[in-house]
Amino acid sequence: MIDSRFRLLLVLAAAALGPSASALQLPKVFTDGAVLQRDRAVPVWGSAAAGKQVVVKFAGQEKSTRAAADGKWRIDLDALPASAEGRVLEVREEGGAKLEVKDLLVGEVWLASGQSNMEWPISRSRPEDQAIAASGPVPLLRVLTVPKKLSAYRLDDFDGRWQAATPDSVRHFSAVAYFFGRRLTEELGIPVGMIHSSWGGSRIEPWLADEGLAGIPDLREMRDFRKARSPGTAEYDHLMRRHLKATRAWIDAAARALHERRPLPGQPSAPPQLPLGHGQALGTYQAMIHPLVPYGIRGFLWYQGESNLGEGMLYTLKMEALIKGWRQQFGVPAAPFLFVQLAPYHYGDNREGALPAIWVAQQHVLKLPHTGMAVTMDIGNPADIHPTHKSEVARRLALWALADTYGKPGIVKSGPLFEKMEIAGDAIRIRFSGAPTGLTTRDGKPPSHFEVAGPDWNFQPATAEIAAGEALVTLRSDAVKSPVMARFAWRQAAEPNLMNREGLPAAAFHSHWPDDPVLGRNLALQRPFTASDPNPSGWNSGLTDGSWHGAAGTCFATGAAPGFPKHVTIDLGRAREVHTARFGVPEFGATRTVVLSLSEDGKQFQEIGKHEFPGKSKAATELRWDKRPARFIRASFPDHHGKLDQYDENHAFLTELEVYGPTQ
């Protein structure tokens, strides 16, 4: 018979754990000093005893609901106008339990996230910025930091509290978030709440709400992969149930084997999970963003990308997923999403094209509605990945918010952005947007960091001339008599001098990357590939990276095993209609004939053309055919030249392989 005292303890423990006895609670985003979002419904939520009535009172409103079986409840207050009057939010549970949150303001709320440059505190910013923050409190500004934490599951709460923006409270707060919020209070004259949730060194993947991956065909594989490895999803639960069934069968089989003194059978492996970590695939959204959902906010700030360097246009797709997912989770489908383009920095001699590719990928995010990009080409430090001029970064983000979100007239929000290119004989004309009153340079010298090239993609420095009163630059180069393409600031440490007359810098561009003006999008860009003779030294990264640089170690190379033919096969991810391929070889190596073939299933390949390259010459060619569906494109190397330089003739080299299909 169970001891009565033990029975009592069991009853008390069950009551304490059960939702029916849950104490009335609010998440930490509702603490004294909070700012509520104006001009839209205000969600208030928490937990209480199951079935109990919950009443919320604020600013003359009183609304009620009942807690669900799991104790959760939510009430949406009617939209409120901005107010700097500190008022009390009262939440009462049927039976007498009551909570009060004091000194609540109503205004604008923004969520700032990313990696170290967003996390970078005022205390480590430039002295001028520190002096501004130390000069006194900002009465209309409140700040909240979500502490660093990881979780494989979506959490409901976090440890943190709102604070008034005083010199002491903001010293270790995000400098970008602080100066952005401060700027809004000055321009709007209403309360502003800045929520900061970032982690230095984090990749974009752990910040994703997986709902954002839906509807992006090129991320379908990523979506399916994550679903099958994320605890709590239907796909993972199905795999786990199957694993448990197999484990039970194994236990029975193991017991029989033990009884019969036979070797135990192999134990079933548990379904794999996404790796947890701020630099991995999972964890920061679940613990640092989701606990804020569905708090009323106006928009998002984002400063990240260094940890995803090398992904090129794949980063654009991940940004799209991030933006869609956050907007969906917070219930704000048109919320502004403002982000910072990375500053120049020397990441290494073998990564010269990686940062320009991310710059272009970030600029392509502007095609999504209600987005904005602050360019930082002129305020970085090529020797320091953490430039300290954070107040100017924040000012440039605020220009987008003030112009687009708040409709302030007369604001030029962006610097010059590439608009179109025109060929004019021996010259190329580049027209920019973002320069309504014309172009200039910050040092009074001719525009720097422009290059032009012919069909061989061999870029040479170009002289640049600004057309008076126009957003137009004319480029020429004595080394390229018939230019067909141009690029600007296509170096990781580039600090060009071109800007608009409002002082905002021009963004880097490439007229033919990632989209060819005639052929459209390169379908092979960033796609995976496999080689029949893999290079053991890692010279296999350059085939689909979008760079025609062709330097040793950065282009594609097979191994040097004797015996030809060899081949490399690109997987486009799904069957696509294709009609053109562009490929080339570096000036070194013994690559001779390259044969291209297509396949829908990866087994049966059909040859569509070939090209023979001369030795010791950087060269590129283009093959065209009647459009046909293909998922796999293979480059085969049936032969080679004799040994021409220091490289073994059994290596096969390619600088790049691009694939094009009909434009959508």
Which role fits each region the language model picked out?
Residues 1-9:
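Bacterial N-terminal signal peptides that target proteins for export
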Residues 22-519:
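Cell-envelope and extracellular/periplasmic
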Residues 512-526, 661-664:
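Low-complexity, Pro/Thr/Ser/Gly/Ala-rich linker/spacer regions in secreted
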Residues 519-549:
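Predominantly extracellular/luminal regions of secreted and cell-surface proteins
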Residues 519, 538, 548-609, 617-664:
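Aromatic, loop-rich ligand-recognition surfaces of beta-strand-rich domains
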Residues 57-59, 453, 489-491, 532, ...:
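Predominantly extracellular/luminal cell-surface or secreted proteins
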